[in-house]
């Protein structure tokens, strides 16, 4: 503390102001949160990261400092209350976030809508949904773990939706924390043009505060829960480093921003406002990532992070949101939605999440244009169904606040709206508007599921109906071959969570079978077909002929199915073409080699023939069935399997054992790195070989190793693996035994 500050503190009754101390009361407001605000006073942000990086703890601190909650609770707190945003009992028990939760709060008279998202890879669709409707994000990184597998996934998702972000290096208080290593990983692994705008004053148990490089001041967090901020001079032993890091920040900004670059070349001194303006411009354009530091658990660095959200992340008016106008026979026309909060344009909103609440189905929406009031009618652009708005609510985790109207930029919820995730709503059905939908990854793991008691079947059906509607990555189907019900999802944890929710929320205990991999079947090369379906034995008959070719799609599209109508003339009348496509898609549900779905195939219908009386859509559908059976016999087929990106971290002495086990599981090592007695290995391993790996890793590393994995792509199986899958399928169908009998005879 400087001498002048000390004298002022001792002598003046206004000593808090002299120390430039700020309490949360000066920042937050207990005014009505849902009141209408100008567009520059709104931020829509998400908090995303790898599992256990401290996202939910950070959100809890944000809500506390902004006056939204009166006391803080920890994620796995001893008081058994749990974090505010983890409202589901399972979330509090496991200490993980399963669903993204929405809330809103006020900071310096700005309304901040926050979505806290899961970090676990099995719930990645929750992150997709959140990022689709946000204008900015806070990417939380652990000061020890650094850039981990799910961090890279979230980074890819942010890139897909062009979401500007701030990076917050959390957990400075942990043993082994090294924010400088995390910054270098951000640059090397994530290709971010990133630099510190804050530095830690000490790490681990010596974490005292932070240095603000933009304002060139030290910030200390004092009082109960770090509510009072004291600004002081930068400590003597950090001045050289602070100057060097500030210069580094200026150089990175000058490379990313032309206006700032000109000032840099002219060698003019930079003001605080120059740097802040450049940070805002580059952050919104995604050409630079400001890096902040702190420890949410120890209440340090959260208030400056909130300031940065206001200063550097965009308001809804600074983000360009597009919609597509469907035109018959033409490509959709792109139009830019008007973000002004004046209600002059027709309402346009996107449903990004469905949830069955206590009062019926809850639909989360983001308003992109216009205004929506209670009593208005809106139309679903996909189904054209009309819905009357009886109730509008804003959400705070699992609590609600009724509002009379919402404007462009607001996140809100409706009751009783029948729709799907990614549906567009508008007040003018003639607009033909549709917004870009949400990317949904394919499920990779299936398990057999059945209720323990037959009397619970009704509740089981209700639970399945609700969960499949809420979560597009959770699928349910009945397998006729083995006569069992199956659920599919993004991983074992994903399916286990739903099984537990069935018991807790519906009183329906269920049994899950062993996990099964979602293999796919595809063609190796093109295969032509010419099939005639003819059934004319008196009365109305059936006649259809189709000619064409089935061919593989490129490897990067091997999870898709395509149908192309290349017919010219009237040999195959246009009204019968949908029948051919329907037959193709029906047959694609079950392949010949292993009974799994077909994928990565293009069906090209080139020619055919019809009968003036006996042809029908049904006849052409059956012709497609026959043509595909013909291709099953004549084509070369192979099985595709899901490949996972696996990241294993363990003490150095176990490196050989870990790499040996991954190789044994047909893994391909893609990289390794080591720090301070620990190593991390990155590999690509078939999902089929990863079952049981958790136990093996625990036993081979004395319980010290941990791993994460996420879906990467589908790739052809090894020949011996394919032979084994085909043999097992044939035996399950009784084909193997029949062949053996034939051979004996």
Curated annotation (Swiss-Prot):
Tell me which family the UniProt entry assigns to this protein.
Belongs to the TRAFAC class translation factor GTPase superfamily. Classic translation factor GTPase family. EF-G/EF-2 subfamily.
Principal location listed in the UniProt entry: mitochondrion
Function summary: Mitochondrial GTPase that catalyzes the GTP-dependent ribosomal translocation step during translation elongation. During this step, the ribosome changes from the pre-translocational (PRE) to the post-translocational (POST) state as the newly formed A-site-bound peptidyl-tRNA and P-site-bound deacylated tRNA move to the P and E sites, respectively. Catalyzes the coordinated movement of the two tRNA molecules, the mRNA and conformational changes in the ribosome.
Gene Ontology cellular component? mitochondrion; nucleus
Q: Which GO terms describe its biological process?
A: mitochondrial translational elongation
Work out whether the entry's keyword set contains Isomerase.
no
Transit peptide boundaries, per UniProt? 1-15
Under the heading SMART domains, the entry gives: EFG_C, EFG_IV
What GO molecular function annotations does the UniProt record carry, in alphabetical order? GTP binding; GTPase activity; translation elongation factor activity
- Tell me which species this is from: Drosophila ananassae
- Which amino acids does the record list as binding GTP? 49-56, 116-120, 170-173
Gene encoding this polypeptide?
Answer: ico
Q: Record's InterPro entries? A: EFG_II, EFG_III, EFG_III/V, EFG_IV, EFG_V, EFG_V-like, EFTu-like_2, G_TR_CS
Annotated keywords: Elongation factor, GTP-binding, Mitochondrion, Nucleotide-binding, Protein biosynthesis, Transit peptide
Instruction: Name the pathway.
Output: Protein biosynthesis; polypeptide chain elongation
What protein am I looking at? Elongation factor G, mitochondrial
Q: Where is the tr-type G domain?
A: 40-317
Q: Which HAMAP family match?
A: EF_G_EF_2_B
